[in-house]
Amino acid sequence: MTFLLGAGTIGIDVTVSRALACSVAVKANRPRGLTRMFVGRQPEEAPVLAGQVFSLCGFAQSVAARLAVLAAADLAMNDEERLGASAGLLAERIFETLRALILQWPTPLPERFAADAGRHLREALAASLAIISHAKAGRTSRPRLAAAAERLSAAATALGIPGRGDTPLPETACAAILRDVEDDHVFAGRRPDPLTISDDAEVVARLRDEAGYASLPHLSGRIAETGAYARSASAGLPEAPHLARRLRARIGDVRISLTQLTALARTGDFDCASLACSGPTPGAGGYGAVECARGRLYHQIEIGGDGRLAAYRILAPTEWNFHPAGPFVETLLSSPVGADEAAVRSISRLAVLFDPCVAFEINVREAADA
């Protein structure tokens, strides 16, 4: 079974024995070498190119690139640019989370929700794109932002995002998805080991110094995770089924992001460190890190003696979560997933809630057939 998202795929091969996942192999088949197209260009070209190359979270990619370029020059965003960047990051995070939940959920929505969900998603997309386009043009104003944020909030509410907490509103698409997993006890609960700003120094140093780190990142003695579940304080609650906790974390993340976006429009003041940060790196370099829908995204650059980009590195959130020895594999391994289509259904739910940025393919086989 294949779920389409974007370029490349993640292969998930699971061997089951007596209905338990006894072996899990995850292999990414993604286009490599994309960062080579940045090398040799002027640093100021990187943000625009990053936003064009990546179809998902393009604004987050652009902001991470911009932060890295500024950090390499020992510069920072001014207040106006920071306002636009924060607004755009929040808007994109809200829409991308909603889009992935509604469109990628493996169980079809009940007919009474499906048509309305599509309409509300289109409204959310239009509001998000309005905020992002104003940010790109440097024309973010608080009144304009407030109007777009209200429109985005209305669409999210219609899809089930609550005003408080993480329980979806009744008779909505998100409530239907929660019903699909609220009694699913296939996967045991696990507390996430969040990737945070405190890890940036080590991550960026390894990204710069270790070949292949961008595709197989690691932190010694840890199984680091990034994204809504890792960001959520409620992720440690043990009583709810694991899939329901992951879903609630994403619903809660959208609610929090909407609250932050509304406050930003009202006051113009926001602690950007919770969304994005940057710093210099050796060799006339810099990095930018942003918290996007799927987790923490890194861009790291080096500028050569000719003033052009001499090196460019990107580390995406999916590489942490779907690492061959990462949190997705740890959660899946030894779980009673069943066999055949039942196993595919359970694994696909888990994969969607880990939210990869590319398609995934699931293959399940019995140990006797391996």
Swiss-Prot record:
This is Hydrogenase expression/formation protein HupK. It comes from Rhizobium leguminosarum bv. viciae. Disulfide bonds: none annotated. InterPro entries: Ni-dep_hyd_lsu, NiFe-Hase_large, NiFe/NiFeSe_hydrgnase_LSU. The gene is hupK. Pfam families: NiFeSe_Hases. Belongs to the HupK family. GO terms for molecular function: nickel cation binding.
